[in-house]
């Protein structure tokens, strides 16, 4: 019962990850301090997000040697081949005593690439530059993609926060506060960098409870409603005028028919 969202920002060549703070079962839920997104021991260039079993989360966060140190294994050498042939046996070993009540999945960010590892030890790499796991994953992923299209002027953190908020409002088992991480030590101004200028036209469809800078919109709500009222009044006026003309024509026709 979790939501973890990952996004690869191509402008800064960095992966950002965010997760919720909820622990729950079918009846109860509580907030926890354990981060669901973190760096494995000794590797600031790698980022991991876990959903499902908290035992898996504990092991991935605190057991050393899951990934060799950077002086033994460079970031560029960690690719799909390495994860399948070298990383997968390590995960298989530490999950040998897991049972069916310990389901899990994880996101692994290396460099600017995102991988998803599933409970059967299969590894997937999405074609999109984002992915999400957990009960709220599909909702968060959909909301985030919409925000990328409609609100690219918002910072990465703002877009991720909005997407996670939508997931938590729609799915039982995930809840704020949200924890954010990135797989490099980059300045805060890069984290909040506007990725590109807004070039969209038309009306934006964004939830009214999300802060939106109306100065960047193509038309304000008041202007839109005013235009609708004006068109409606003009249309009704034309109908009344046409009705009056038809009535006069009908009366003249009746007068001519009289013997």
Annotated model-derived regions:
Residues 1-100, 124-157, 174-183:
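Conserved short S/T/G-enriched processing/targeting/catalytic segments and their helical context
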Residues 40, 50, 171, 200, ...:
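Intrinsically disordered, low-complexity segments enriched in small/polar residues
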Residues 56, 69, 177, 206, ...:
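Intrinsically disordered, low-complexity, compositionally biased regions/tails
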Residues 95-118, 169-185:
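Conserved phosphate-donor
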């Amino acid at each position: 019962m979790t939501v973890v969202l990952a996004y690869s920002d191509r402008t800064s060549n960095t992966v950002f990850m965010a997760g919720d703070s909820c622990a729950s079962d079918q009846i109860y839920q509580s907030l926890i301090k354990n981060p669901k997104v973190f760096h494995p021991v000794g590797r600031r260039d790698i980022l991991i997000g876990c959903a499902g079993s908290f035992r898996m989360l504990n092991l991935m966060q605190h057991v050393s040697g899951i990934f060799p140190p950077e002086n033994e294994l460079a970031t560029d050498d960690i690719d799909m081949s390495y994860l399948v042939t070298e990383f997968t046996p390590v995960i298989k070993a530490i999950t040998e005593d897991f049972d069916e009540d310990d389901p899990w999945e994880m996101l692994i960010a290396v460099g600017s690439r995102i991988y998803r590892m599933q409970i059967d030890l299969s590894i997937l790499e999405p074609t999109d530059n984002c992915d999400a796991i957990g009960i709220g994953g599909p909702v968060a992923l959909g909301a985030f993609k919409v925000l990328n299209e409609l609100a690219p002027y918002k910072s990465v953190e703002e877009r991720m926060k909005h997407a996670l908020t939508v997931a938590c409002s729609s799915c039982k088992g995930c809840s704020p506060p949200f924890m954010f991480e990135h797989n490099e030590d980059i300045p805060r101004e890069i984290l909040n960098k506007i990725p590109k200028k807004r070039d969209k036209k038309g009306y934006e469809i964004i939830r009214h409870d999300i802060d939106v800078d109306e100065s960047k919109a193509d038309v304000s709500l008041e202007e839109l409603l005013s235009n609708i009222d004006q068109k409606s009044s003009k249309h009704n006026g034309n109908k009344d005028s046409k009705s009056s003309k038809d009535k006069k024509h009908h009366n003249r026709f009746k007068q001519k028919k009289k013997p």
